[in-house]
Amino acid sequence: MSKVIEVNHPLVLHKLSMVRSKDTGSKDFKELVKEISMLLTYEATRDINMDEVEIETPVCKTKCRVVSGKKMAIVPILRAGLGMVDGVLSLIPAAKIGHIGLYRDEETLQPVEYFCKLPKDIEERDVIVVDPMLATGGSAADALTMLKEKGAKNLKLMCLISAPEGIKLVQEKHPDVDIYVASIDEKLNEKGYIVPGLGDAGDRLYGTK
């Protein structure tokens, strides 16, 4: 079974309180999502591969550890996932970016892909899938399935807020994918919103309703 890592660092909790507030405007909301994403990335890359190299300081030669040449990719689930990309890139600037867009057919309830653009060598990369909200878990699970079908092997999922229902579904369908989240909230309401949540992340990021 995959691990679920709830990142309860004081800075994450502080910024999360502001991102939840209905009084936080779109501009500040975007910046907070970026900052929380950066802090989550710090945790999600704790097991990143490293190499030992020799460098020369102004005083002497010494050995240091640096991130290895392992390739990475960031894949946001459109559209809200785009708000997390800059925060991740601030720590992993060399990562390639893919995009996945999908929706559910109202009659069949099956996922319908409307956009998918990934690095050509996705099978060689460590992949972090990002989406601010993990509610029912359907979109995240479908995106992970699509990535695996296209060759991706080493996957992680990173979200700001999740519901227990979403975590359960992703773990059932993808027991090999670890989940990094700033908060595991109480539940989903009858409309499928996370409670207490933060509302619709996409609408708040882009000022739409």
From Swiss-Prot:
UniProt: uracil binding residues: 194, 199-201
Database matches in InterPro entries: PRibTrfase_dom, PRTase-like, Upp_B, UPRTase/APRTase, Ura_phspho_trans
Pathway: Pyrimidine metabolism; UMP biosynthesis via salvage pathway; UMP from uracil: step 1/1
Keyword Methyltransferase: no
Pfam families found in the cross-reference section: UPRTase
Note describing how the cofactor binds: Binds 1 Mg(2+) ion per subunit. The magnesium is bound as Mg-PRPP.
Reaction catalyzed: UMP + diphosphate = 5-phospho-alpha-D-ribose 1-diphosphate + uracil
Cofactor: Mg(2+)
Catalytic activity, EC: 2.4.2.9
Function, as annotated: Catalyzes the conversion of uracil and 5-phospho-alpha-D-ribose 1-diphosphate (PRPP) to UMP and diphosphate.
Annotated family: Belongs to the UPRTase family.
Identification of the protein by name: Uracil phosphoribosyltransferase
Source organism per UniProt: Clostridium botulinum (strain Eklund 17B / Type B)
